[in-house]
A protein has these predicted regions:
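Acidic/histidine-rich catalytic cores of soluble enzymes
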Residues: 33, 125-220
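A short, acidic, amphipathic alpha-helical segment used as a generic capping/interface helix at domain edges
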Residues: 218-232
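Acidic-and-aromatic substrate-binding clefts and catalytic sites of carbohydrate-active enzymes
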Residues: 11-17, 34-46, 109-114, 143-148, ...
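Active-site acidic/histidine proton-transfer and metal-coordination neighborhood
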Residues: 53, 73-163, 260
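N-terminal pre-domain/capping segments
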Residues: 1-89, 95, 132, 150, ...
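A short, acidic, flexible beta-alpha connecting loop/helix-capping segment that sits on the rim
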Residues: 13, 240-262
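Hydrophobic faces of well-ordered beta-strands that scaffold small-molecule active sites
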Residues: 4-10, 33-35, 58-63, 102-104, ...
Length: 282
């Protein structure tokens, strides 16, 4: 897109291999892609090769989150160590394939009291220190438990290697539509742009089934307001969209996407991406 690069996240639900997705993203008009790494180093290598072949930007590698909660819990020291080492390995992959950013969650868990600990800050500090040594930026993403995100960013966002990944959908369905760009937009380095229907439960109980990853403009997001918020941060780097063509369990909001041929769905993703980007840049 003129004066704005657009990126789409690969997705195991798209029905073709991630390297093939890179080719299809290019054909649809996107400039870049990212990959969720869950221990499959060969997947990252194959996507990097596809990116080189099709002249696509490898925007980021998304780290796993299975040890994120343990990294805050002194009673789970062995798993906390595993979490730190897992993040370090993901950083190594970024170095190996010239990927500038690792996206990382800082917590995962529902139905509990969110209390950041010094133990957690110390563990994430080890990851941050390693990223700094390796020349990789970490984009910490908003998920459930913004208390943990705030704790990590307040401790480390003064460092050049630390920034914020804003997930517009998580903000609506996990963070009660708090304006997190107002809080951390000064270090915005990555985006996961998507839509949803907010929190389904009347009493405000959050759950991952609400994290629909609809195309922008298909949910309740106020996209004029969101565009103005992004614009206010001054962020001019590649915009990443994280979208899903499959519905969550016992939900049907994404079914219409799954009924489309993948090429048609990706074309619609690109249309929505351009529409939102133009609202930021006008």
């Amino acid at each position: 897109m003129y004066k704005r690069k657009l990126c789409l996240s690969t997705n195991s639900t798209f029905g073709v291999s991630e390297p093939e997705q890179v080719r299809l993203f290019k054909e649809a008009g996107f400039d870049g892609f990212n990959v969720l790494w869950w221990g499959d180093d060969a997947l990252v290598e194959n996507c990097a090769r596809a990116g080189e072949e099709h002249k696509m930007i490898f925007q980021s590698i998304h780290a796993p989150w299975n040890y994120c909660a343990d990294m805050w819990d002194e009673n789970e020291k062995e798993d906390a160590i595993k979490g730190v080492e897992q993040f370090k390995h993901c950083i190594d992959l970024c170095v190996k394939y010239n990927v500038p950013v690792m996206v990382a969650h800082v917590y995962v868990g529902f139905d509990e009291e969110y209390k950041p600990t010094a133990f957690g800050i110390e563990n994430y500090g080890k990851v941050v220190e390693y990223a700094s040594e390796k020349g990789v930026k970490i984009a910490f993403e908003n998920t459930e438990g913004t208390e943990y995100l705030d704790a990590v960013l307040n401790a480390y966002k003064h460092l050049e290697c630390v920034g914020f990944c804003w997930d517009s959908g998580h903000e609506m369905c996990y963070n009660y539509s708090e304006n997190l760009l107002e809080r951390h937009g000064d270090v915005l380095i990555a985006t996961h742009i998507n839509d949803n229907l907010g929190i389904r439960d009347y009493n405000g109980k959050i759950f991952w089934h609400d994290d629909l990853h609809l195309l922008p403009f298909d949910g309740i997001g106020d996209w004029d307001e969101l565009a103005q918020r992004v614009k206010k941060t001054g962020f001019s780097d590649i915009l990443t969209f994280e979208l899903n063509n499959k519905s969550k369990p016992n939900r049907h909001e994404n079914d219409k996407y799954d009924e489309m041929p993948l090429e048609k769905y990706l074309a619609e993703c690109y249309i929505r991406a351009c529409r939102f980007a133009s609202m930021i840049d006008r």
